[in-house]
Amino acid sequence: LAWVWLPQAQPLSSQRISEQLAVVDQSLMDRYFKRRHDRLLKARQKVSAADIPQFLALDSTSISTYSETIASAAYGHARQDPHLRQVNLSLGVDYETGDVCYAYESEGSTNDKQLYLAIVQRMIDHQFDLSNTVLVTDRGYHSLMNMQKLINLELKFVQGVTRAEDSVRRLFDQHRVSLDDPAFTDGRLEVAA
């Protein structure tokens, strides 16, 4: 697809890519994505009279590298190529538009649970308006500490949890009838309340 959108563009060498990445630091990325996020919220307000929250899906991936110049590359928990160092890339994506609203690059040995609060705190520190945003994560980000911090910050969130936790399993069993009742289902979001 690159030749369709950028017909005159030539692929960059790995050396040139490393040089370009060396001048982009996280604070530049934070400022850039703050502007993107603000633009998206303004566009949402113009289109929707209702105060519908933004759903911001957060997820991370590890990228393996042979590079010796990437400072944040570290040995992590790679399933593929465990002999290579890796870098974590976390993205915040607007559910409705698919726009990337935030990106965070971190050391490859950091797991999602540790990363979650760092990402949220960076967004808060850079004045991201999260007042009408629901943060959505998978179970890899779940910990009681993370949940309590989000509650303390008065942030809205949906977080996957492993059913292996006895307390969660008991709650599912206790409320099974209500969860299966169509009256408690939001058809638009396809979730049970």
Question: Can you say where each PLM-predicted feature lies in the sequence?
Answer:
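Conserved, well-structured functional cores that handle cations and Mg-NTP chemistry
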Residues: 1-193
